[in-house]
């Protein structure tokens, strides 16, 4: 009598789960595929309507019409040349500005939030609860309410229309303080006691703890980089010179002049804007997942 293969039920479940998730996967990736293929389309092709079902039950030209609507007639790099040749938007300059702002905010926010979280988790001091409530308030209060005070503050310090004036407000984050407070609370006390027995100063103890929480550092750095990369409000208030603006502001201007800029060039700019965050998430996904699982 043959024995049933114990792996068959599990394999069947995976197949059924994959089939059930396939429509959701297609719904998620369709906008990205549409954007990428839109790079190579002319404006006439771009605005062709997409029919999701045939007008007639036996319409033999339906599938060819779907292909003609979804795929470009010709794959050409002309749209990339149009984008990079635009005088209205210095694309590589604003791309570099966004990269500098996002990296600066991510590194600064990780450093400042980690130190604040360590202090909240391991020390008792006067006003601790009040400061922690303020950190929560930074999350709950809409950022729009801080826009004008931040602009006035930067103007007073001479930081308006500078990338540093955009980076500096972004390193202060209530979410990071709460996140790292929880991270350092989960560390065993034995590590801290061992470091303090050796007579190390508190800063040295803190630096000793950092390798133990480096997945959390990497995860939060990734989150903050992505948030800073897509930030629109603060750069809009702070930056006025075209060469100082960030990528979201340039994309906004690019779409505002859609009559003179091809839709393919707009899709190319949007695709370029997506690449850094997509690559960062793909590289850091496993560490991000393990950090969240340890925290929860």
Regions found by a protein language model. Give the residues of each.
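A structural signal for multi-pass alpha-helical bundles of membrane permease subunits
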Residues: 4-296
């Amino acid at each position: 009598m043959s024995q049933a293969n114990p792996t068959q039920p599990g394999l069947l479940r995976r197949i059924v789960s994959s089939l059930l998730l396939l429509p959701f996967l297609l719904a998620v990736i369709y906008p990205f595929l549409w954007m990428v293929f839109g790079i190579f389309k002319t404006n006439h092709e771009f605005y062709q309507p997409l029919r999701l079902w045939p007008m007639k039950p036996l319409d033999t030209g339906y599938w060819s019409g779907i292909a003609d609507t979804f795929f470009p007639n010709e794959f050409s790099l002309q749209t990339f040349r149009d984008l990079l040749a635009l005088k209205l938007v210095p694309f590589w300059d604003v791309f570099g500005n966004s990269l500098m702002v996002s990296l600066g905010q991510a590194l600064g926010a990780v450093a400042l939030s980690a130190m604040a979280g360590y202090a909240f988790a391991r020390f008792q001091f006067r006003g601790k609860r009040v400061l922690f409530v303020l950190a929560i308030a930074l999350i709950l209060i809409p950022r729009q309410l801080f826009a004008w005070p931040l602009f006035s503050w930067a103007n007073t310090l001479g930081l308006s229309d500078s990338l540093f004036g955009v980076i500096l407000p972004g390193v202060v984050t209530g979410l990071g303080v709460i996140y790292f407070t929880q991270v350092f609370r989960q560390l065993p006390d034995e590590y801290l006691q061992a470091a303090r027995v050796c007579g190390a100063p508190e800063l040295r103890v803190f630096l000793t703890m950092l390798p133990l929480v480096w997945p959390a550092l990497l995860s939060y750095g990734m989150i903050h980089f992505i948030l800073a990369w897509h930030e629109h409000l603060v750069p809009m208030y702070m930056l006025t010179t075209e060469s100082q603006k960030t990528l979201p502001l340039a994309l906004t201007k690019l779409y505002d002049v859609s009559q003179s800029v091809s839709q393919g060039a707009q899709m190319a700019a949007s695709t370029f804007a997506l690449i850094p965050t997509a690559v960062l998430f793909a590289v850091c996904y496993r560490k991000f997942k393990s950090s969240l699982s340890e925290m929860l």
